[in-house]
Amino acid sequence: MEDVREKIKAIEEMIQVVLLAIPREISAHAYYLNASQRATSDMSRNLFLSLAEQEKDHEMKLKHIVEELKRELQNCKGSLREIKKQKVQ
């Protein structure tokens, strides 16, 4: 049972870390998008647009990771409930 509790704690910590990273990706996306609008050449504009797109991809990947971690967290919590239920019986 203790190993399940430790896994739950680890997953919760991972979720918090990833949730902290998402706003940074959003901010970076906005930064590069703004830079692309101020760019003075097509080459630099395209570079900044590419970087902005990459930051948006990072944001989406992180959101997907959070959803996967939340599913895993629910599975672990369900396992913990089952273990507790079996101990009572």
Q: What do the PLM-derived regions correspond to, one by one?
A:
Residues 1-89:
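Non-heme di-metal
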